[in-house]
């Protein structure tokens, strides 16, 4: 009897409480490009709030040969809840599709977003990207190699304003086995395909005009060690580009992908560029932090910079 009365009174208390309205809607399986007979799809996460919003391209990982647009739904959801329009994309995968197919698809997605901005409440001048692992590599490459329109006949700008790259390899010019591990993706080793390895190397394209870049990486990541990501971080820092590196203590490659602290920092960094009025405590250019403690990584820059010559990049650059 007591249990029944408790349930009855609870029902009275909550009877007038309507379910919370979702902060955004999801539109799935939208074709952003067709290559041959293959339709490339995306899912759009659109805030319900009125007006236009900054947009973020979400690019999945999977070693450039697996994965799909649903893989980083947690990233898209977190950003959409903050008021960003998010577009999570599929792209062509190796070994059937060799590089540069993957980055070409990312650029096609950027063009599509800008072309269709008015249909998705997007401010086309505020476009960023986030990705992890292979996706982190691709968004970092977007940030350093985007191109302005080459003419006035409808060509659309592929430059983005900011990127957040997690677990991202950024330099493919140095490898101990001559890059044979990447033959499935490049179509050859470092000697035979040196131009492609160079074209895939984010760090090789860094200059002062690049978009700001936020990196996050697990300190125990053996698949993509921090030194591999730091190659680009140091290059950007030297060029005077706004950049941050967030180290996730004791995290491996998969653990770092869903670290809530890293995702929050990435969202904050994207907002700091795409939403000019956005402010976060302790934010600033070229900040390095580990588990939210800036002092925890105060000596790591010099230590990891020394590792660049022997931990990940054993051998000599080709070309």
Region locations from a protein language model:
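N-terminal cap/lid segment of alpha/beta-hydrolase-fold proteins
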Residues: 21-50
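Mobile cap/lid helix-loop segments that gate and shape the active-site cleft of serine hydrolases
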Residues: 35, 173-205, 211
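C-terminal catalytic histidine-bearing segment of alpha/beta-hydrolase fold enzymes
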Residues: 43, 216, 227-292, 301-315, ...
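Short beta-strand element of the alpha/beta-hydrolase
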Residues: 52-61
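A fold-wide structural signal in alpha/beta-hydrolase
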Residues: 55, 80-87, 92
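Catalytic nucleophile-loop/oxyanion-hole region of alpha/beta-hydrolase
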Residues: 67-69, 75, 87-124, 256-262
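Primarily recognizes the serine-hydrolase "nucleophile elbow" in alpha/beta-hydrolase
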Residues: 111-177
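Short beta-strand/loop motif that positions the catalytic acidic residue
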Residues: 215-217, 221
């Amino acid at each position: 009897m007591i249990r029944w009365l408790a349930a009855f009174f609870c029902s009275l208390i909550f009877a007038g409480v309507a379910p919370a309205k979702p902060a955004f809607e999801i539109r799935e399986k939208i074709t952003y490009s067709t290559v041959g007979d293959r339709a490339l799809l995306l899912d759009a996460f659109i805030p319900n709030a009125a007006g236009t919003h900054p947009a973020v391209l979400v690019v999945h990982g999977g070693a450039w040969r697996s994965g799909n647009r649903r893989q980083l739904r947690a990233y898209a959801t977190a950003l959409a809840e903050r008021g960003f329009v998010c577009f999570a994309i599929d792209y062509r995968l190796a070994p059937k599709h060799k590089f540069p197919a993957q980055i070409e698809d990312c650029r096609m997605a950027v063009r599509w977003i800008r072309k269709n901005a008015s249909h998705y409440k997007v401010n086309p001048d505020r476009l960023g990207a986030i990705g992890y692992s292979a996706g982190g590599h691709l968004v970092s490459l977007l940030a350093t190699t985007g191109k302005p329109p080459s003419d006035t006949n409808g060509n659309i700008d592929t430059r983005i304003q900011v990127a957040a790259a997690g677990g991202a390899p950024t330099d493919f010019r140095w490898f101990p086995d001559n890059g044979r591990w990447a033959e499935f993706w490049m179509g050859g080793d470092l000697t035979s395909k040196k131009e492609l390895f160079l074209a895939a190397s984010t760090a090789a394209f860094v200059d002062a005009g690049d978009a700001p870049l936020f990196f996050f990486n697990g300190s125990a990541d053996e698949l993509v060690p921090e030194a591999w990501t730091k190659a680009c971080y140091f290059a950007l820092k030297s060029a005077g580009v706004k950049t941050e590196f967030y180290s996730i203590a004791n995290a491996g490659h998969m653990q770092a992908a869903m670290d809530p602290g890293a995702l929050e920092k990435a969202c904050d960094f994207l907002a700091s560029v795409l939403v000019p009025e956005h402010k976060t405590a302790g934010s600033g250019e070229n900040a390095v932090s580990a588990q939210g403690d800036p002092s925890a990584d105060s000596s790591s820059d010099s230590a990891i910079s020394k590792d660049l010559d022997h931990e990940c990049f054993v051998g000599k650059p080709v070309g």
